[in-house]
Amino acid sequence: MKHSVHFGAGNIGRGFIGEILFKNGFHIDFVDVNNQIIHALNEKGKYEIEIAQKGQSRIEVTNVAGINSKEHPEQVIEAIQRTDIITTAIGPNILPFIAELLAKGIEARRVAGNTQALDVMACKNMIGGSQFLYQEVKKYLSPEGLTFADNYIGFPNAAVDRIVPAQSHEDSLFVVVEPFNEWVVETKRLKNPDLRLKDVHYEEDLEPFIERKLFSVNSGHATSAYIGAHYGAKTILEALQNPNIKSRIESVLAEIRSLLIAKWNFDKKELENYHKVIIERFENPFIVDEVSRVARTPIRKLGYNERFIRPIRELKELSLSYKNLLKTVGYAFDYRDVNDEESIRLGELLAKQSVKDVVIQVTGLDDQELIDQIVEYI
C-alpha cells in the first residue's frame, strides 16, 4: 500500500485531503499535536465523513494512524523517510513550525539512500504556499541535504477549495463537509509526476487558479460574513437569505470577475457559472456555517495581499470598478466579536488612533487616494 504523511489532523485535513488520499489507496499518517485526535486515530484506525447534501451520505476513511509530533518527532522522521507523498493542511503561520521536522525527514531519506522522488504539498490557501514552506525547510538542511532536496524533493504549490464549517461532535473524528471540492496542483515543480492523484487537477501555471479561488470564494465568503454580521445574521445561510445581502455579494463577485478576466483571460461565461456555483454553495441548507467563523481575524483578512485589498489595488491599476469591494472593507473594519481577538484589537486601534492611521497600519497601503476612499466607508 502507498504511504502518505499529512500534517494537520483538523477538519480540513480529515474531511478533504484525507478523503482524497484514501480514495487513491494511501495509508495516511496524520501528524498533529492534538492528543485527543491522535489517540482516536490510533484507537480506531478509521473515521467517517458526512457529505452535507440531500441523503447525507457517509464515507468511511480507513488505514489511518496518528503521530503526535511534539511527543514523538522521531516517528514523524521515520514516516517521512519512507513515505510516497507529504501534504499539509495547516495555516501559513504554522508552516515554519514543521519545517525543522520536515528537514530532518529529508535528511533521513538521504542517509538511507532513498532516492524515490517525493512531493510536498501545502494545501492551505496561500499564494506560493509550498514554496514558502521549502524556504523554511532549507534553513535546517545541511549542504548535502540541500543538494538532495533539489534533486529528489518537490514542493509544488497547490490550491484547495472545500467548505468545512466549525463543528463539534461526540465522535471527535467525525466531520461534515460540503459536496464540492477542488484541489489543483502545479505540474512544473513536481518531482514525481508519475504519481497523479485522481480527483485532483494538475495545471502548468497555478497562479490563475489560486487567484480565482482566493478572490472568488474567500472574498465572497468573507463578504457574506461581514455584511451579514452588519445586518445581524448568525450564519452564512441566513445572510444569503436576505436579498439585499445576496445582491451585494453578487456585485462584489462581478468586480472580481472583471479583474480575473482582464488579468488571466478567463472565459466570461465559465466564470459567471463558477460564481453562480459559489453562491449556491454558500446557500447549502445542510451546512451550518457561523458568521463568526468566516469573519474571524479581520486584521489578517484586511492585509495588503489578502482577499480584499489585493483585488482592490489591482482593479484600481486597471481603472476598473471596485466600489462594492470598498463597501465590504468598511464592514470588515466595523466588525466586532467579543470572542475574536483581532476584531477587538481593531476596535481598540480605531478608538485610539485616527481612522486613516489605522487603515494604513492594517492594510499596508501607501496609495493616498485609495486610503482616503477606504476611510470614507468606515
From Swiss-Prot:
> Which UniProt keywords are given for this protein, alphabetically ordered?
NAD, Oxidoreductase
Intrachain disulfide bonds: none
Q: Which GO terms describe its biological process?
A: mannitol catabolic process
Tell me the InterPro entries matching this sequence: 6-PGluconate_DH-like_C_sf, 6PGD_dom2, Mannitol_1_phos_5_DH, Mannitol_DH, Mannitol_DH_C, Mannitol_DH_CS, Mannitol_DH_N, NAD(P)-bd_dom_sf
- Uppermost EC category: oxidoreductase
- Any single Pfam family the record assigns to this protein: Mannitol_dh
Q: Does the keyword NAD apply?
A: yes
Q: What is its EC number?
A: 1.1.1.17
Reaction equation(s) it catalyzes: D-mannitol 1-phosphate + NAD(+) = beta-D-fructose 6-phosphate + NADH + H(+)
GO cellular component terms, A-Z: cytosol
Task: Extract the GO molecular function terms from the UniProt entry.
Answer: mannitol-1-phosphate 5-dehydrogenase activity
Q: Which domain of life is it from?
A: Bacteria
Q: What positions does the entry give for NAD(+) binding?
A: S4, V5, H6, F7, G8, A9, G10, N11, I12, G13, R14, G15
Does the keyword field hold NAD? yes
Locate the transmembrane regions by residue number.
Answer: none
PANTHER family per the record?
ALTRONATE OXIDOREDUCTASE-RELATED, MANNITOL-1-PHOSPHATE 5-DEHYDROGENASE
NCBIfam families reported in the protein's UniProt record: PRK02318.1-3 (NF002647), PRK02318.2-5 (NF002652)
Instruction: Name the family the entry cites.
Output: Belongs to the mannitol dehydrogenase family.
- Please report the name of this protein according to its UniProt entry: Mannitol-1-phosphate 5-dehydrogenase
